[in-house]
Structures are given as C-alpha cells and as structure tokens.
C-alpha cells in the first residue's frame, strides 16, 4: 500500500471515510474549474478533527494546504502534494447577540451579510456578493464597494500550524490591504465575531440590491473565474490599466481577459491552469512595459510547479 493511502486511512479514522478523498481533482473544488489532483483532500466536520489532522500531518512532516470554497484560488495542473483541508459548509454555525454576529469559518460571507440584514444590522452590505467563505474573507481582509472586513471584525479564534487554538482581538488582527496577521502567520480561521450597528432593514436591503445589480452588470458572474485577479495598484485601477493596454478579450488557450470586466480572467470552457498563469504573466509584463506599474496578484496560486 502506498504511503499516501496509509496516511489517508489514518485521516479517515479522524474525519470519517466519507470526508476523505484520494487523488481528488482540484478543478472540482475551485471556481476557476482548473487544477490537478490533491494527494488527499479532507473535509473536517469539527474543530477537534481539524486540530487532530494538523497534528498528525506535522508529526509525519506532511505538507498541509487549507482552503475555503476555492473562489480565490488557482491550483496548478500538477495538483497539490500532501493534504488539502477544505473548510466549507461542515463548519458553518452562527449566533447573533444584540449587534454582534459570531460565525464559523466555513459559512459563506454572503450568507453572513444576509443574516445581518435579517437581524436589522448594518455594516456588511458590501459583502453581499463576495463569493468566498468567512474564514478566507477574514484572513485576506476581503472588501468591495468601500467596505472591508477590518471595519467589522472584533475577535477571531484561529488555529496555528501546530493545531493549537489562539485568539486575536481588534488591532491584533493587523489588517492591511488584502492581508492580516492570521494570513501572514499561516493561521486558520475557526470563528469570527463581527460588531455591526442597528439599521433600517429597508435601507439595508436597498443597498444590498443595488450592489448586487452593479455586480451583475459589471462582472462576468456567469463564467468560471476567481474574481479580481490583481490587487489595486496604488493610484490606479487594475481593470483600467489592462483595458488601456488593449487586452480586453485577449486569450491564451482557454483563458480570456473578460470582455465584461478587464480585471477578471475567465475560463471559456477548456482552460488549463497554465493558460491562466501564462495570461496573468502576459498582462503583468504588458502593463509594466506600457505604464511602469507592477501588478500583484490578489488570487492565491498553489500547487506543484
């Protein structure tokens, strides 16, 4: 029996056979619909299972990659060696007390935005169309339309690389543009508390509807993508720079600069991760040559080179 099969058996004892997959194609777990196989993919159903899996992998010196629902992720075509831990809808419980929502990392951020509205709480309207999980959103300080997670997050329970639970509060998060203390230290968000404000439900709903409509009009939501590919360069808009380079609709293989929004790359149906990565590099080089601006990716790129 192969070493990875033996490891998979051990992980099955922790998380259950139904939650462990061998040689799982990562294209089934990313919004871009690309990516080679993960040696082992596990979806833990509790914090205790997550901790046990991390400790097991550490003891065996097996690399671990933790993901949410794969909406901000490019996995290379050769896939991911070691263990991929997917924290999604198995860890999605939440509570609401007065003006504070506390929720586990696997819940969708858009769902948390809806929960806020249902409870007459304002502050998370910006998040209504962000497709990722709460955990990923907190780790990278996700934001849109003038709002960011740093505006509402007051406390986060996270797990360090050793499987131990830690807590950060307020400024301890060290939020920056698309980054945080937790991300910099490879922490795994377990649950987060967000402090909101009492608001008018009709006004909250109206703003959410407006932002949703703007997204639908301006973003290629009907095609596989990973949202905004690039961080916003200081003083510029990434999409505008790409458009001004004449790259709207530019294709490499099955990857295309979106006709609808130049800040997005879409999978036209048969893209490989290599097509997307080659297109990213082409865009970066073109923008650098024309405008002298360095474009940094917002999307996570992982997997065997």
Curated annotation (Swiss-Prot):
Belongs to the MurB family. This is UDP-N-acetylenolpyruvoylglucosamine reductase. It comes from Acetivibrio thermocellus (strain ATCC 27405 / DSM 1237 / JCM 9322 / NBRC 103400 / NCIMB 10682 / NRRL B-4536 / VPI 7372). The keyword Cytoplasm applies. The lineage of its organism: Bacteria, Bacillati, Bacillota, Clostridia, Eubacteriales. GO terms for cellular component: cytosol. It is an enzyme of class 1 (oxidoreductase). Residues 34-199 form the FAD-binding PCMH-type domain. InterPro entries: FAD-bd_PCMH (IPR016166), FAD-bd_PCMH-like_sf (IPR036318), FAD-bd_PCMH_sub1 (IPR016167), FAD-bd_PCMH_sub2 (IPR016169), MurB (IPR003170), MurB_C (IPR011601), MurB_C_sf (IPR036635), Oxid_FAD_bind_N (IPR006094). Pathway: Cell wall biogenesis; peptidoglycan biosynthesis. Its cofactor is FAD. GO terms for biological process: cell division; cell wall organization; peptidoglycan biosynthetic process; regulation of cell shape. Keywords: Cell cycle, Cell division, Cell shape, Cell wall biogenesis/degradation, Cytoplasm, FAD, Flavoprotein, NADP, Oxidoreductase, Peptidoglycan synthesis.
């Amino acid at each position: 029996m192969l070493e990875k099969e033996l490891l998979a058996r051990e992980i099955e004892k922790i998380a259950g056979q139904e939650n462990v997959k061998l040689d799982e194609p990562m294209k089934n777990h990313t919004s871009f619909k690309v990516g080679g196989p993960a040696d082992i993919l596990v979806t833990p159903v509790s914090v205790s299972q997550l901790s046990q899996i991390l400790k097991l992998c550490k003891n065996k010196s097996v690399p671990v990659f933790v993901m949410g629902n794969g909406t901000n992720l490019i996995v290379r075509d050769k896939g991911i060696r070691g263990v991929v831990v997917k924290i999604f809808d198995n860890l999605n419980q939440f509570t609401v007390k007065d003006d504070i929502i506390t929720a586990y990392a696997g819940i969708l951020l858009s769902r948390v935005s809806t929960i806020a509205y249902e409870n007459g709480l304002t502050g998370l309207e910006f998040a209504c169309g962000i497709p990722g999980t709460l955990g990923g959103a907190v780790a990278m300080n996700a934001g849109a339309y003038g709002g960011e997670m740093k505006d509402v997050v007051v406390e986060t329970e996270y797990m360090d690389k050793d499987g131990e639970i830690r807590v950060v509060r307020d400024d301890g998060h060290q939020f920056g543009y698309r980054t945080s203390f937790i991300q910099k230290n490879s922490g795994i968000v377990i649950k987060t508390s967000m402090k909101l404000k009492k608001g008018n439900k009709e006004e909250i709903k109206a703003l959410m509807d407006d932002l949703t409509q703007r997204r639908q009009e301006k973003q290629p939501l009907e095609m596989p993508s990973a949202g905004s590919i690039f961080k916003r360069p200081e003083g510029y808009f990434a999409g505008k720079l790409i458009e001004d380079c004449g790259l709207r609709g530019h294709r490499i293989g099955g990857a295309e600069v979106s006709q609808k929004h130049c800040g997005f790359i879409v999978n036209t149906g048969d893209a490989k991760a290599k097509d997307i990565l080659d297109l990213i590099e082409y865009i970066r080089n073109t923008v650098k040559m024309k405008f002298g601006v360095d474009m940094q990716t917002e999307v996570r790129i992982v997997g065997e080179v």
